[in-house]
């Protein structure tokens, strides 16, 4: 990764009556614009996210999406949909006076990158996508219902289902929704920690015991659940795949971990079949962007796409 430099410009943008989103710029003010779209939904961005881009070459824009990270109010699901986030990205671009930019997103960030590019293809110079997630029911069931990745980590799964009454475990996402939006804050925080611990375990190529902070877990647990319950506000299983024609002209590199248990290879494969113009690069890695094989592959992907952006 590149040196992590401090932002030269940052602030908050009022994007609705309720929400203010945090934004920052680092790197070269006159460089090639790139926006980093974090995962989750609700994960927020970290300073390390700047490190995928050469700060001498890129004007690096990072935002925290509605309800998470440094954005305000925290863990708020009201007025918080995929299409709200797409509109927010455009508001940031317009505020910063950027004509077109490279869009870089992983996991949920890949969903949002594709949704944004398909809505505003004229504003996208290129796409670098990692850990493809299309927000299809089959993908959320794999993650958070019995019979998916639960078969691989049954001991961790037992902890994940523990907050849910046995007679509700046939619809865990719905059952968790009731807990994560409960009026009792202790109920919310306990459920959020169980949800986040499960996911944190899955994203590591070499899993280790995790103990996430309950309050820090609330945004990702609540917002992921909110989006999953609502199908990401996408119309059907092939909502993104059926609109690839809008972005086939955009230079695109897909980086996918072969052993990714959070966003399995099948979604990257489906995207590459629908979008043969994109280059699919499969890495011997899991899901987490900061694992060394994925870091190297992502930095290389950004370097390789650069000539197409100039």
Swiss-Prot record:
**Cellular-component GO terms for this entry:** cytoplasm
Q: Alphabetically, which GO biological process terms does the record hold?
A: proteolysis
Q: Which UniProt keywords apply?
A: Aminopeptidase, Cytoplasm, Hydrolase, Protease
Q: Write out the annotated subcellular location.
A: Cytoplasm
User: Mind listing the GO molecular function terms for this protein?
Assistant: aminopeptidase activity
EC number of the protein: 3.4.11.5
Q: Which reaction does it catalyse?
A: Release of N-terminal proline from a peptide
Domain AB hydrolase-1, which positions?
33-290
Q: Name one Pfam family in it.
A: Abhydrolase_1
Which sites are catalytic?
Answer: 107, 260, 287
The job of this chain, per UniProt, is described as:
Specifically catalyzes the removal of N-terminal proline residues from peptides.
UniProt-listed PANTHER family: PROLINE IMINOPEPTIDASE
> Which family does this protein fall into?
Belongs to the peptidase S33 family.
Question: What is the protein's given name?
Answer: Proline iminopeptidase
Gene source species? Neisseria meningitidis serogroup A / serotype 4A (strain DSM 15465 / Z2491)
Lineage runs:
Bacteria, Pseudomonadati, Pseudomonadota, Betaproteobacteria, Neisseriales
């Amino acid at each position: 990764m590149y040196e992590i430099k401090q932002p030269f410009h940052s602030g908050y943008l009022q994007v609705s009556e309720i929400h203010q989103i945090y934004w920052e710029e680092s790197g070269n003010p006159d460089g090639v614009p790139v926006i980093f779209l974090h995962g989750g939904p609700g994960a927020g961005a970290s300073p390390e996210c700047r490190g995928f881009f050469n700060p001498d070459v890129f004007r690096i824009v990072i935002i925290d999406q509605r309800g998470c990270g440094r954005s305000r109010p925290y863990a708020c699901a009201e007025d918080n949909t995929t299409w709200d986030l797409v509109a927010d990205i455009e508001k940031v671009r317009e505020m910063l006076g950027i004509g077109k930019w490279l869009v870089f997103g992983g996991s949920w960030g890949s969903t949002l990158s594709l949704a944004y590019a398909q809505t505003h293809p004229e504003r996208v110079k290129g796409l670098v996508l990692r850990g493809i997630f299309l927000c299809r029911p089959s993908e959320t069931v794999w993650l958070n219902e019995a019979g998916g990745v639960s078969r691989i980590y049954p001991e961790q799964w037992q902890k994940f289902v523990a907050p849910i009454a046995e007679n509700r475990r046939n619809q865990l996402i719905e059952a968790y929704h009731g807990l994560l939006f409960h009026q009792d804050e202790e109920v919310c925080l306990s459920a959020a920690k169980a949800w986040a611990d499960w996911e944190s375990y899955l994203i590591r190529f070499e899993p280790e015991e995790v103990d996430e902070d309950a309050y820090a877990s609330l945004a990702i647990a609540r917002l992921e659940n909110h989006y999953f319950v609502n199908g990401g506000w996408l119309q059907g299983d092939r909502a993104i795949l059926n609109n690839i024609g809008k972005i086939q002209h955009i230079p695109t590199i897909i980086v996918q971990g072969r052993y990714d248990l959070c966003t399995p290879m099948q979604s990257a494969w489906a995207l590459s079949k629908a979008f043969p113009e994109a280059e699919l690069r499969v890495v011997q890695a899991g899901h987490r962007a900061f694992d060394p094989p994925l870091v190297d592959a992502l930095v290389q992907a950004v370097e390789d796409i650069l000539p197409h952006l100039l």
